[in-house]
């Protein structure tokens, strides 16, 4: 990290830092003085929210960050998932971004991968709403890459 990073949290808000969950009881500002892996509570996807292929991929990438003990398992599941998604999507923008997301995770930049995945949600919603990906394929993906269900 080249400079410090300052984050403000409201009372009752949680933040996930290097696998630990912290909740603040009042408005606070945190200043990170070195490299840290963190997720703000509003960026944490719960399992029941992982309802589409890209949201499932997000959930898996998120687990790489917030569950360091299970990082190897989550990374293996991410590899399986990204391979499946690359063969299922036809949209060139999504395919190019999935390749970039794979490279981000491969180089230890899962946090950046999460941001990139969130950026694809609108395109994915369009694809699913227009049935450009058959519902049977969506269901197959859901079954294959959702072991937490």
Swiss-Prot record:
GO annotation (BP), single: mRNA catabolic process
UniProt signal peptide: none
Keyword Phosphoprotein: no
InterPro entries, alphabetized: Flagellum_FlbT
GO molecular function: mRNA 5'-UTR binding
Keyword field: Bacterial flagellum biogenesis, Repressor, RNA-binding
Pfam families xref list: FlbT
Task of the protein: Has a post-transcriptional repressor function in flagellum biogenesis. Associates with the 5'-UTR of fljK mRNA and promotes its degradation.
Similarity-based family: Belongs to the FlbT family.
Protein name per Swiss-Prot or TrEMBL: Probable flagellum biosynthesis repressor protein FlbT
Lineage, highest ranks first: Bacteria, Pseudomonadati, Pseudomonadota, Alphaproteobacteria, Hyphomicrobiales
Gene that specifies this protein: flbT
């Amino acid at each position: 990290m080249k400079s410090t990073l300052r984050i403000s949290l409201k009372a009752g808000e949680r933040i996930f830092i290097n696998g630990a969950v912290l909740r603040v009881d009042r408005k606070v500002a945190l200043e990170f003085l070195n490299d840290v892996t963190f997720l703000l509570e509003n960026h944490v996807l719960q399992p029941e929210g992982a309802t589409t292929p890209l949201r499932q991929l997000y959930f898996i990438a998120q687990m790489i960050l917030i569950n360091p003990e299970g990082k190897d398992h989550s990374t293996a599941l991410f590899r399986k998932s990204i391979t499946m998604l690359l063969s299922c999507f036809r949209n060139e923008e999504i395919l190019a971004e999935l390749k970039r997301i794979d490279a981000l995770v491969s180089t230890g930049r899962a946090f950046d991968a999460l941001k990139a995945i969130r950026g694809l949600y609108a395109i994915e919603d369009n694809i699913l709403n227009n049935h450009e990906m058959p519902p049977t394929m969506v269901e197959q993906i859901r079954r294959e890459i959702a072991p937490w269900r």
